[in-house]
């Protein structure tokens, strides 16, 4: 599982010109899924996203999590995070999970985040989306967790 995590002042996602998800201060999560991802990876990634201390306290020190600030999370599925560009001029997406499998794992991830009680908004799985992100910082991190069988 691979996530591009961005600290945002606000973020929204549109499908066919309609806003389907919007948050203010919080995290924008672009989520890539592989066929080997299991419940363990989903739980680890959800916990990591909720608990990472990347928001500043009053002194400016990065000591608060999205839970601490009661921020929102906008979660967007993005299979292109597993694009392999080493050969040729067109990326290969062979390492990305097939659609139905990826959607099931994505929904498990969203469910784990929602269990936190925070506002969790999503894109539309498999749709062409316009994602608007106002970065804060910018603070952008790449989170990766391979299944134990892949380590």
Swiss-Prot record:
* Gene Ontology biological process terms, A to Z: D-amino acid catabolic process
Q: Which domain of life is it from?
A: Bacteria
Please indicate if the UniProt record lists Thylakoid as a keyword: no
Which GO MF terms does the UniProt record name?
D-tyrosyl-tRNA(Tyr) deacylase activity; Gly-tRNA(Ala) deacylase activity; Ser(Gly)-tRNA(Ala) hydrolase activity; tRNA binding
Residues making up the signal peptide according to the UniProt record: none
Reaction equation(s) it catalyzes:
glycyl-tRNA(Ala) + H2O = tRNA(Ala) + glycine + H(+); a D-aminoacyl-tRNA + H2O = a tRNA + a D-alpha-amino acid + H(+)
The cross-references to InterPro entries, in alphabetical order and at most eight, read:
Daa-tRNA_deacyls_DTD, DTD-like_sf
Query: Which cell locations does it reside in?
Result: Cytoplasm
> Under which EC number(s) is this enzyme classified?
3.1.1.96
Q: Where do transmembrane segments lie in this chain?
A: none
Q: Where is this motif: Gly-cisPro motif, important for rejection of L-amino acids?
A: 137-138
Q: CDD domains in the record, alphabetically?
A: Dtyr_deacylase
Question: Would I find Hydrolase among this entry's keywords?
Answer: yes
What keywords does the record list, in alphabetical order? Cytoplasm, Hydrolase, RNA-binding, tRNA-binding
* GO CC aspect terms: cytoplasm
Q: Which family does it belong to?
A: Belongs to the DTD family.
Q: What is known of its domains?
A: A Gly-cisPro motif from one monomer fits into the active site of the other monomer to allow specific chiral rejection of L-amino acids.
What the protein does comes down to:
An aminoacyl-tRNA editing enzyme that deacylates mischarged D-aminoacyl-tRNAs. Also deacylates mischarged glycyl-tRNA(Ala), protecting cells against glycine mischarging by AlaRS. Acts via tRNA-based rather than protein-based catalysis; rejects L-amino acids rather than detecting D-amino acids in the active site. By recycling D-aminoacyl-tRNA to D-amino acids and free tRNA molecules, this enzyme counteracts the toxicity associated with the formation of D-aminoacyl-tRNA entities in vivo and helps enforce protein L-homochirality.
Subunit structure, interactors included: Homodimer.
NCBIfam families, alphabetically?
Answer: D-aminoacyl-tRNA deacylase (TIGR00256)
> What name does this protein carry?
D-aminoacyl-tRNA deacylase
- The species this protein belongs to is Acaryochloris marina (strain MBIC 11017)
Q: Which gene encodes it?
A: dtd
């Amino acid at each position: 599982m691979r996530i591009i995590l961005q600290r945002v002042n606000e973020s929204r996602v549109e499908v066919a010109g309609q806003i389907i998800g919007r948050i203010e201060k919080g995290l924008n999560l672009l989520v890539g899924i592989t066929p080997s991802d299991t419940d363990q990876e989903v739980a680890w990634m959800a916990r990591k996203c909720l608990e990472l201390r990347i928001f500043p306290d009053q002194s400016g020190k990065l000591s608060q999590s999205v839970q601490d600030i009661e921020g929102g999370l906008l979660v967007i599925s993005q299979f292109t995070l597993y694009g392999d560009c080493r050969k040729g001029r067109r990326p290969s997406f062979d390492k990305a999970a097939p659609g139905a499998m990826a959607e099931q794992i994505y929904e498990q991830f969203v469910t784990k985040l929602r269990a936190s009680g925070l506002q969790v908004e999503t894109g539309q799985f498999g749709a062409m989306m316009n994602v608007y992100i106002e970065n804060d910082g910018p603070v952008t991190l790449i989170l990766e967790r391979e299944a134990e069988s892949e380590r």
